[in-house]
A protein has these predicted regions:
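A compositional/biophysical signature of low hydrophobicity enriched in polar/charged and small residues
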Residues: 1-156
């Protein structure tokens, strides 16, 4: 397993906070030459530590005022059903996160919508994708913390 030094961690920490920095700006902030910074950043990308760089959009400015966490239970647990279900769910743009769970809930989805009527449209589409035993929706009342930054304390 590769190991990462202080400079690698600084690159990751800095890019998690602002991926729009040019290589020269990043190098200056962490105290490396531009060439060394570029090589290290490319190595982190090649190793898959940096998957991609994206723009984080404002949910509110996009008029997506409703966040819904949807718990799904199903009686189906075979591989072919899961593949069909997963492909159907992945095709719904309002589903922004999708997990297979342990415990009483088989799947958990995070859905963003304009309003309750818009969520109802998404819900109706969702239940048409596959035969589901139980669908439970919980509406977020307030976002207290939302971060895309991952902790770096576990990096070898």
């Amino acid at each position: 397993m590769p190991t990462y030094d202080r400079a690698d961690r600084l690159i990751l920490e800095t890019l998690q906070n602002d991926a729009s920095l040019s290589n020269a700006e990043l190098a200056e902030r962490i105290g490396l030459s531009a060439n060394a910074c570029w090589r290290r950043t490319r190595r982190l990308e090649e190793r898959g530590v940096i998957r991609k760089q994206v723009a984080l959009l404002s949910q509110e400015k996009l008029n997506l005022k409703v966040t819904v966490f949807v718990g799904i239970r199903t009686n189906e647990h075979n591989e072919s059903w899961l593949e069909r279900f997963a492909e159907g769910v992945k095709a719904i743009p309002e589903v922004v996160e999708f997990y297979r769970m342990s415990g009483d809930t088989d799947y958990l989805l995070k859905i963003v919508a304009e309003d309750i009527a818009d969520y109802d449209r998404v819900y109706k589409h969702l239940i048409s994708v596959a035969n589901l035993h139980d669908v439970s929706s919980s509406f977020a009342m307030e976002r207290i913390k939302s971060s895309t930054a991952l902790p770096l304390t576990h990096l070898p």
